[in-house]
Amino acid sequence: MADEEIAALVVDNGSGMCKAGFAGDDAPRAVFPSIVGRPRHQGVMVGMGQKDSYVGDEAQSKRGILTLKYPIEHGIVTNWDDMEKIWHHTFYNELRVAPEEHPVLLTEAPLNPKANREKMTQIMFETFNTPAMYVAIQAVLSLYASGRTTGIVMDSGDGVTHTVPIYEGYALPHAILRLDLAGRDLTDYLMKILTERGYSFTTTAEREIVRDIKEKLCYVALDFEQEMATAASSSSLEKSYELPDGQVITIGNERFRCPEAIFQPSFLGMESCGIHETTFNSIMKCDVDIRKDLYANTVLSGGTTMYPGIADRMQKEITALAPSTMKIKIIAPPERKYSVWIGGSILASLSTFQQMWISKQEYDESGPSIVHRKCF
């Protein structure tokens, strides 16, 4: 562990989960849902010390009486007041540090609106008075974590999926592709197809139950049509899940129909390409000389790549798209759920990175737009 006195803080603000900790650590200290919950009902017990808002795990545990909101949608902050609450919670309750004493490394999805970055920078310096900060691209950090400098990262979280080709440490911006289809859309889709089975999930709290079902029971089929046939002819693929009230529900083909949507977005009524095609298209936008290295270093990262069977399916789909002699290797590190954070921890503790920070002084001289000059 780096010296905690001056260690940089690494905060990976995902659309679904916030991962936070100290640079130099090998895993985040705090991982909690990026949720702000507000009571749906009037408090009647005087002196109960009810709060007007709850953040993270506390909101999750009281979800039955709260309306849950995610301030980050598709990787873009849509509610800055709630976002500030999440950061405040991160620094003061989870990490128990004073942000004015530590440099802060934040992460962002590529191709985000410029205003999003500027506002993040402004809040860090003006609200939390950080001495220095930096905004890094999520996928680039995942590649650092895998110990590579060349490869294409397919990063899929709760809010956004993106493919970023990186060569010798340089991201190739013209070839970055982004798909606004990720874990949250899969959760919504699972809610929908479970309704067809006669199980109704509607509230924001029930959506969290469905997310848990998704995380525990879903998997990616190697051959979708064949799997559908198997599911229709036998009950071998059925699994049961116990709801919080003790009721047990059974799910069958929903287990693989749900994540199939990232390979076939038409399931969600979207016109975009699946993740395999997006990855392929991204490689094809790169110079012909470096494609071979990208095919051989396709790195998966993010929570939505955690489904069993996803690496084999990617291998199969990309092999079908690529030239027949091409060697294709899909790298799916076991810790890929946190690889963005781990990469941030590595980056912020490199001695060569120390001159990259945006200092409070630079911010005061140039204003929020400094972030575009100093952070790729």
Swiss-Prot record:
Keywords: ATP-binding, Cytoplasm, Cytoskeleton, Hydrolase, Nucleotide-binding, Oxidation. Oxidation of Met-45 and Met-48 by MICALs (MICAL1, MICAL2 or MICAL3) to form methionine sulfoxide promotes actin filament depolymerization. MICAL1 and MICAL2 produce the (R)-S-oxide form. The (R)-S-oxide form is reverted by MSRB1 and MSRB2, which promote actin repolymerization. The modification Methionine (R)-sulfoxide is found at residues 45, 48. GO terms for cellular component: actin cytoskeleton; actin filament; axon; cytoplasm; cytoskeleton; dense body; focal adhesion; membrane. Its main location: cytoplasm. It catalyses: ATP + H2O = ADP + phosphate + H(+). GO terms for biological process: axonogenesis; cell motility. It is found in: Cytoplasm, Cytoskeleton. GO terms for molecular function: ATP binding; hydrolase activity; protein kinase binding; structural constituent of postsynaptic actin cytoskeleton. Pfam families: Actin. Its EC number is 3.6.4.-. Polymerization of globular actin (G-actin) leads to a structural filament (F-actin) in the form of a two-stranded helix. Each actin can bind to 4 others. Belongs to the actin family. Actins are highly conserved proteins that are involved in various types of cell motility and are ubiquitously expressed in all eukaryotic cells. This is Actin, cytoplasmic type 5. It comes from Gallus gallus.
